[in-house]
């Protein structure tokens, strides 16, 4: 007369554990993708800033070196256009010798710096980056030839994890012939 029907609807413990496992895997994968995207964005932003800083420094040095004058008095570069003190230190007479006098670019403590007669030493690149290599090479500074300066610079970001690194080289000759 009475039929007992099983009207208990629900999940078994195994079904619940399987669904929690699948949900955890999906959330873990989504979190991993999000964290990877943030790391990639941070790396890209650092790389863009590195390009900006390096480009500014190279343009600044190129303009100053291109506009340099021959040191006819011999006070700055011993009568030459450029004087390489060591491979990471260049000295020359500024285009406006009255205002700036002798100008220098050099590497000091992993920072690219500039100095002239009338100003203190100033950094050209943000302290968030370190210059791992700076080399100046002068060719053709003998009498009768137009001098050229080749600059090689390697800059790297400072921070935890993988940081971008940039190597750049350029060659500059003086704008005004003074041979």
Each language-model region and where it sits:
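Aliphatic-rich helix starts adjacent to a transmembrane/signal segment
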Residues: 2-4, 8-62, 66
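Generic beta-structure capping elements
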Residues: 36, 115-117, 154
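Short regulatory "switch" loops immediately downstream of catalytic or recognition motifs
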Residues: 69-73, 157
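Type IV pilin-like appendage domain
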Residues: 72-143
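Short linear sequence signals and composition-biased patches located at protein termini or domain-edge surfaces
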Residues: 121, 128-179
């Amino acid at each position: 007369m009475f039929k007992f029907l099983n009207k208990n609807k629900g999940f078994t413990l195994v079904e619940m554990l399987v669904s929690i496992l699948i949900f955890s895997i999906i959330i873990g994968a989504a979190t991993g993708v999000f964290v990877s995207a943030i790391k990639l964005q941070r790396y890209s932003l650092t790389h863009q800033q590195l390009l900006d800083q390096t480009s500014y420094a190279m343009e600044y040095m190129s303009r100053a070196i291109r506009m340099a004058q021959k040191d006819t008095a011999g006070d700055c570069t011993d009568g030459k256009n450029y004087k390489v003190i060591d491979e990471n230190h260049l000295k020359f007479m500024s285009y406006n010798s009255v205002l700036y006098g002798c100008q220098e670019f050099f590497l000091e403590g992993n920072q690219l710096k500039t100095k002239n007669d009338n100003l203190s030493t100033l950094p050209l690149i943000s302290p968030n980056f370190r210059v791992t290599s700076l080399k100046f090479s002068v060719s053709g500074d003998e009498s009768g030839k137009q001098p050229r300066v080749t600059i090689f610079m390697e800059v790297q970001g400072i921070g935890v994890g993988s940081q971008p690194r940039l190597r750049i080289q350029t060659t500059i000759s003086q704008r005004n012939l003074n041979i």
